[in-house]
UniProtKB/Swiss-Prot annotation:
Lineage per the UniProt record: Eukaryota, Metazoa, Chordata, Craniata, Vertebrata
InterPro entries listed in its UniProt record: bHLH_dom, CLOCK-like, HLH_DNA-bd_sf, Nuc_translocat, PAC, PAS, PAS-like_dom_sf, PAS_fold
Compartments, record wording: Nucleus
Regulation of this protein's activity per its record: Carbon monoxide (CO) and the redox state of the cell can modulate the transcriptional activity of the NPAS2-BMAL1 heterodimer. NADH and NADPH enhance the DNA-binding activity of the heterodimer whereas CO binds the heme group in NPAS2 and inhibits the DNA-binding activity of the heterodimer.
A GO CC annotation given for this chain: CLOCK-BMAL transcription complex
bHLH domain: residues covered: 9-59
Gene that this polypeptide is encoded by: NPAS2
Tissue and organ expression note: Expressed in the retinal photoreceptor cells (at protein level). Expressed in the pineal gland and retina.
Protein name, entry field: Neuronal PAS domain-containing protein 2
Annotated segments matching region Disordered: 1-21, 405-467, 584-656, 728-815
Pfam hit, one: PAS_11
Sites where the protein binds heme b: H119, H171
Region feature (Sufficient for heterodimer formation with BMAL1, E-box binding and for the effect of NADPH): 1-61
GO molecular function: DNA binding; DNA-binding transcription factor activity, RNA polymerase II-specific; metal ion binding; protein dimerization activity; RNA polymerase II cis-regulatory region sequence-specific DNA binding
Length: 815
C-alpha cells in the first residue's frame, strides 16, 4: 500500500510538472503568433515556428548587408545609423539625393526635397527631370545624362568602374500650393556618379518618353542611373518642416485678447522647440509666416465675433528656424462673475504638408492638378483651323511644359517676421522667375483670314494643295500625361484616376473636333475650286456669244459659162481647199476658248434657221467628202463634218458636177469686193492632227496679222487657206437653188475632187496661178452683211464637231 501511494504521488507530481511545462510552451507559442504579421487565422504550433524561423533568417541577411554597407570611417559618429547620419548631412548641406536614369526618369528622391523645393517625393517619382527644368536647359542636361549610355558596352563598364563624377549647375522648378502661380526656379548644383542598378520597376516617365533611343538602352539586367546629391547654390536658412514623423501631435496654449502668450503646455517644447518662459508675453503673430498673416487675421476676427472656431492651416516658426504647419481650435473663456472675456484657449495640432496642399487646392477648386497649362492652351485654340497656328500652340505648350506640367507644387519661402534674423529665399538672385506664358486666346477671325489667304492663291495651287493631317502631329504632343497623386485616402486616389480619364477624354474629343474641322475645310476648298471652274467656263461662253458673226451671202449673180481651171504642173500645194455652196443668212461660229474644246481639238459650227454650213480644212487626205466653199474671216470656225448627209434648199443643180461648180465660182474676178487689208494666218505648217497649243497659237496669229492684197485682185491663200474679210459676201450660183434634197444626198456619194491651190510663195512669184472668184458689187456684199448680222447673232447655236485628229487616219491623196 505504501509503495502504491508513493507511485501515485510521483505520477501526480510528474503530471503536474508536465502540465506546467506545456502551459508555458503554449504561452510562448501564443506570443510568437501574436508577433507574426498577417495572422488572420489561428495557426498551429508548427506553422508559428516555421514563420518565426523564416523571419529570423531574413533578419540575419538584412543585418549582414547593413554591416557591409555601414560607413566605417571615423568621421561618422558610431551612435548614428546610416539613415540618421545621411539625414543630418543633407539638412546641413541644404540638399537632397536623387537617382535619375539615362533617359531622365526619376527613380528615387529623398524626403529632404520637400523643405528645400516644396515638392513631395511621391510627386517627383516617375516624372522626367526635364519637366522641372527650363526649356533652354533641356538639350544640355539630356546630353549629360545620355553621355554614358551612348558609349559601347566595354566603355560603359569602364565608366562605371572608374571615378566618373559628373557635376553641373541648372535651375529646378520650385513647388507651390497654387499651381496657377508663375513658376519659380531655384539655382542648384548636381554632383554625382553613374551607377548600375537592378530590381527597380520601369517608370512611366510622365510628360516625356525615354529620351534615349531603344537601340542604345541597356539590357534589363544592366541598367545605368545617375545618382547625385543636389544642393542649393544659395543656402536657405529657413526651411519648411513638411514631413511629420508623428502626425496629430498637439499642445495647448492660452492667449490674451491681443493674442499674446499667457500659458504654454509641456507638450509644446518637443514640437516647436521653445520653452514656456521663452514665448510668454510675446505676440503669436511674431511666429507666423508672412503669407499666412492675412488669413490668420480673418480667423481672429471670426473668433472675436462668434467666440469659438477653427483656424486655417498656417506656418509656425520653430526654434530651429523651420516652418511647421499647425491648425488651431480655439474658444474664448469668460469671467465667472462678470461674464467678461478673459483669455483665449488654443489647441494646436500638427498637420502635414500633403494635407495642407489638398485642403488649399480644394478651397481653390483644384482637387488634383491633372489638367496642365498645355491642355488649356490647346483647348483655347480649338476653334483655330490653321495648321500653322496649331503648330505654334504645340510649340508654346512645349516651351512651358517644364513650368506647368508638373503636378508637384509647394509654397515657397517668403519674408518672415521682423523679430528674427532671416533671409528671404524668394528674393535671392539665384531664383529664375519664368515669364508669364499666357494661354492662347480664341480668335474668331482666324477662319476668315485663312479663307481669304487660300482664295487669293491660284486655282491650280489650290487643287494641288494636300490636306495637312494634324492628327499625325498630335499623338505625342497633344496628349499630356496625367499624374496619379499618392494620397492616403482611397477616395482621393479614385478622384485622381477619374480626373486622369476625364483629361484623356477631353484630349480625344479635341482631336476629333480638329479632324472634323479639317474635313469641313477640305470640302469647302473643293467646292470653291468647282465654282471657279464653272466661272471660267461661263466666261468663255460669254466671250463666244459676244464675238461678231460673219454673214456670207451671195446674191444677184449671173451664172457665167464654166471656165477651165489652169493648174501649173510643177507647183502642187500640200494642202487642199474644200469648198461647199452656201445659202444667204448662214454664219460661221467663232472658235470657243473652252478648255474642253481645246482638249478635244474640235471646233464649233453654227446652225442657221434654214440650212447648215460647215467648212473643212484637210491636209493630205484622200477621203471623199462633200465639196464646200471655205471662207475665212477673223471669227471663222474650222469644223469637220462626218459622213452624214446635209440638206438645204440652196443645193446645186442635178446636172452640174462639183468640179464645174468650183470653176464657176473661181472664174470671176473679186477685186471690187476685196478690202484693203485682211487678217492672215502665217504658220509654217498646219496639220489636221496638230496639238492644242499649236492650234491656239495659229488662231491668235490668224487674228492679229495683217497683210496687203495683191494688185491682181486674187484672194490671199496661205498654206492652202483662202482668207476673206467680214465685208466679203458671196452667194452660190442661181442654178444651184433648184437642186432637190434627194439629188443632194446622191451627190454626197459621188467622187470628190480637190482643188489644189498654191502656197504663199508661189502666189507671190506668179500672178497667173492665183485663183479667181466671181466679182460682186461691194455695196451688195456690205448690205447683205449688215442685214444678216443682227439675225445671226441671235440664232447662233454652237455645236461640237468631231475631233480634227481623226483626219490623221484618212488615206493620203495622190500627188
Amino acid at each position: 500500500m505504501d509503495e502504491d501511494e508513493k507511485d501515485r504521488a510521483k505520477r501526480a507530481s510528474r503530471n503536474k510538472s508536465e502540465k506546467k511545462r506545456r502551459d508555458q510552451f503554449n504561452v510562448l507559442i501564443k506570443e510568437l503568433s501574436s508577433m507574426l504579421p498577417g495572422n488572420t487565422r489561428k495557426m498551429d504550433k508548427t506553422t508559428v515556428l516555421e514563420k518565426v524561423i523564416g523571419f529570423l533568417q531574413k533578419h540575419n541577411e538584412v543585418s549582414a548587408q547593413t554591416e557591409i554597407s555601414e560607413i566605417q570611417q571615423d568621421w561618422k559618429p558610431s551612435f548614428l545609423s546610416n539613415e540618421e547620419f545621411t539625414q543630418l548631412m543633407l539638412e546641413a548641406l541644404d540638399g537632397f539625393i536623387i537617382a535619375v536614369t539615362t533617359g531622365g526618369s526619376i527613380i528615387y528622391v529623398s524626403d529632404s526635397i520637400t523643405p528645400l523645393l516644396g515638392h513631395l517625393p511621391c510627386d517627383v517619382l516617375d516624372q522626367n527631370l526635364l519637366n522641372f527644368l527650363p526649356e533652354q536647359e533641356h538639350s544640355e542636361i539630356y546630353k549629360m545624362l545620355s553621355s554614358c549610355m551612348l558609349m559601347t558596352d566595354s566603355a560603359s563598364s569602364d565608366c562605371l568602374k572608374t571615378d566618373n563624377e559628373l557635376e553641373f549647375y541648372c535651375h529646378l522648378l520650385r513647388g507651390s500650393l497654387n499651381p496657377k502661380e508663375f513658376p519659380t526656379y531655384e539655382y542648384i548644383k548636381f554632383v554625382g556618379n553613374f551607377r548600375s542598378y537592378s530590381n527597380v520597376p520601369n517608370s512611366t516617365c510622365n510628360g516625356f518618353d525615354e529620351a534615349v533611343p531603344r537601340a542604345y538602352r541597356a539590357s534589363p539586367g544592366k541598367q545605368i542611373c545617375f545618382v547625385a546629391t543636389v544642393r542649393l547654390a544659395t543656402p536657405q536658412f529657413l526651411k519648411e518642416m513638411c514631413i511629420v514623423e508623428e502626425p496629430l501631435e498637439e499642445f495647448t496654449s492660452r492667449h490674451s485678447l491681443e493674442w499674446k502668450f499667457l500659458f504654454l503646455d509641456h507638450r509644446a517644447p518637443p514640437i516647436i522647440g521653445y520653452l514656456p518662459f521663452e514665448v510668454l508675453g510675446t505676440s503669436g503673430y511674431d511666429y507666423y509666416h508672412i503669407d499666412d498673416l492675412e488669413l490668420l487675421a480673418r480667423c481672429h476676427e471670426h473668433l472675436m465675433q462668434f467666440g469659438k472656431g477653427k483656424s486655417c492651416c498656417y506656418r509656425f516658426l520653430t526654434k530651429g528656424q523651420q516652418w511647421i504647419w499647425l491648425q488651431t481650435h480655439y474658444y474664448i473663456t469668460y469671467h465667472q462673475w462678470n461674464s467678461k472675456p478673459e483669455f483665449i484657449v488654443c489647441t494646436h495640432m500638427v498637420v502635414s504638408y500633403a494635407d495642407v496642399r489638398v485642403e488649399r487646392r480644394q478651397e481653390m477648386g483644384l482637387e488634383e492638378v491633372s489638367s496642365e497649362v498645355v491642355s488649356s492652351a490647346l483647348k483655347d485654340s480649338g476653334s483655330s483651323l490653321d495648321p500653322e497656328q496649331h503648330f505654334n500652340a504645340l510649340d508654346i505648350g512645349a516651351s512651358i511644359l517644364s513650368a506647368s506640367r508638373t503636378p508637384s507644387v509647394s509654397s515657397r519661402s517668403s519674408p518672415k517676421s521682423s523679430h528674427t534674423p532671416k533671409s528671404d529665399p524668394a528674393s535671392t538672385p539665384t531664383k529664375l522667375t519664368a515669364e508669364a506664358s499666357t494661354p492662347l486666346q480664341r480668335t474668331s477671325s482666324t477662319q476668315q483670314d485663312l479663307s481669304a489667304h487660300r482664295l487669293s492663291q491660284p486655282t491650280a495651287l489650290q487643287a494641288s494643295l494636300p490636306s495637312q493631317p494634324s492628327c499625325e502631329l498630335l499623338p505625342q504632343q497633344l496628349l499630356p500625361q496625367a499624374t496619379l497623386q499618392s494620397q492616403p485616402a482611397p477616395l482621393a486616389q479614385f478622384s485622381a484616376q477619374f480626373s486622369m480619364f476625364q483629361t484623356i477624354k477631353d484630349q480625344l474629343e479635341q482631336r476629333t473636333r480638329i479632324l472634323q474641322a479639317n474635313i469641313r475645310w477640305q470640302q469647302e476648298e473643293l467646292q470653291k475650286i468647282q465654282e471657279q471652274l464653272c466661272l471660267v467656263q461661263d466666261s468663255s461662253v460669254q466671250m463666244f456669244l459676244q464675238q461678231p458673226a460673219v454673214s456670207l451671202s451671195f446674191s444677184n449673180i449671173q451664172q457665167p459659162e464654166p471656165q477651165p481651171l489652169q493648174q501649173r504642173p510643177g507647183v502642187i500645194s500640200q494642202q487642199q481647199l474644200v469648198l461647199s455652196p452656201q445659202l444667204p443668212g448662214q454664219i460661221a461660229s467663232p472658235q470657243t476658248p473652252s478648255q474642253q474644246v481645246l482638249r478635244e481639238a474640235s471646233v464649233i459650227s453654227s446652225q442657221g434657221p434654214k440650212a447648215e454650213r460647215s467648212t473643212e480644212l484637210t491636209t493630205g487626205s484622200s477621203r471623199p467628202t462633200r465639196s464646200t466653199a471655205t471662207l475665212f474671216g477673223p471669227s471663222t470656225s474650222l469644223s469637220r463634218r462626218g459622213p452624214g448627209p446635209s440638206s438645204g434648199p440652196g443645193a446645186s443643180a442635178a446636172g452640174c458636177s462639183h468640179d464645174q461648180q468650183l470653176r464657176l465660182l473661181l472664174s470671176q474676178p473679186i477685186q471690187p469686193m476685196m478690202p484693203t487689208s485682211c487678217n492672215a494666218r502665217h504658220p509654217s505648217d498646219l496639220s489636221m492632227a496638230g496639238s492644242q497649243a499649236k492650234y491656239s497659237q495659229n488662231q491668235q496669229m490668224f487674228q492679229s496679222l495683217e497683210v496687203q492684197t495683191s494688185s491682181s485682185g486674187s484672194p490671199i491663200v496661205l498654206m492652202g487657206q483662202a482668207v476673206l474679210n467680214q465685208g466679203f459676201a458671196t452667194t452660190p450660183p442661181s442654178q444651184s437653188s433648184s437642186l432637190p434634197p434627194m439629188q443632194l444626198q446622191h451627190q454626197q456619194h459621188q467622187q470628190q475632187r480637190y482643188l489644189q491651190v498654191q502656197t504663199p510663195s508661189s502666189l507671190h512669184n506668179e500672178q497667173t496661178d492665183s485663183l479667181l472668184l466671181s466679182s460682186y458689187s461691194p455695196q451688195q456684199g456690205n448690205m447683205g452683211y449688215h442685214q444678216t448680222q443682227q439675225q445671226q447673232q441671235q440664232q447662233q447655236l454652237p455645236r461640237r464637231s468631231n475631233s480634227l485628229s481623226e483626219s490623221s487616219n484618212l488615206p493620203q491623196p495622190l500627188r
